[in-house]
Design a protein with these regions (language model features):
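ATP-dependent adenylation/nucleotidyltransferase module used to activate substrates
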Residues: 2-176
Length: 177
């Protein structure tokens, strides 16, 4: 398929409006949506923390926030990575996050479940009862982000959630009830 704007090869299709976009126009589309959301939310002066898992969505959020605010004198970017304590899982993405923060010159903070709640997710999974790990993980991850954000005096925590993430959370919560 061809890009709806320039006739180059399309790399994605935006379902809700029926638009095919090439790489360049997709990047412009995402940046425009992020800028619109930021204007709507109204970011304050001070520290903006980016929740950084080391995955593609949070890395895109980090780079976009750096492009938008990296040179602002009234805003300072930090990144926060949460280590849930899952053996063999998080160390690789922590290193990816650290590498990108070093490259961009952004201060990187790692906070762990163990540090904040006293248990790793692996330990929680052994004593969880009827509820699955996902129930605890999302709540504790947000708690860790908020605690570290408060500790570094962040005024805002930016997250790289996409519509699929939001939809999945809503559906999971609906199914659990």
């Amino acid at each position: 398929m061809k890009c709806s704007k320039c006739n180059k090869k399309a790399v994605t299709f935006i379902r809700y409006n029926g638009t095919y976009l090439c790489k360049q126009h997709f990047m412009e589309y995402v940046e425009k949506r992020v800028r619109k959301d930021i204007r709507k939310q109204g970011l304050r002066k001070g520290i903006i923390a980016v929740a950084l898992s080391g995955g593609k969505d949070s890395l895109v959020a980090l780079y976009l926030m750096n492009d938008l605010f990296g040179k602002h004198k009234d805003k300072e970017l930090h990144a926060i990575t949460v280590d849930e304590g899952i053996a063999g899982y998080r160390q690789k993405t922590i290193e990816i996050a650290r590498k990108h923060c070093n490259f961009l010159g952004i201060e990187h903070h790692v906070v762990s479940f163990k540090e904040i709640i006293g248990l790793k997710l692996d330990e929680i999974s052994k004593i969880r009862g009827e509820l699955g790990e996902c129930t605890y993980c999302g709540v504790f991850r947000r708690l860790c982000l908020n605690k570290k954000g408060n500790e570094i005096n962040a005024k805002t925590i930016a997250m790289g959630h996409n519509l699929d993430d939001v939809s999945q959370s809503i559906l999971m919560n609906f199914v659990k009830k």
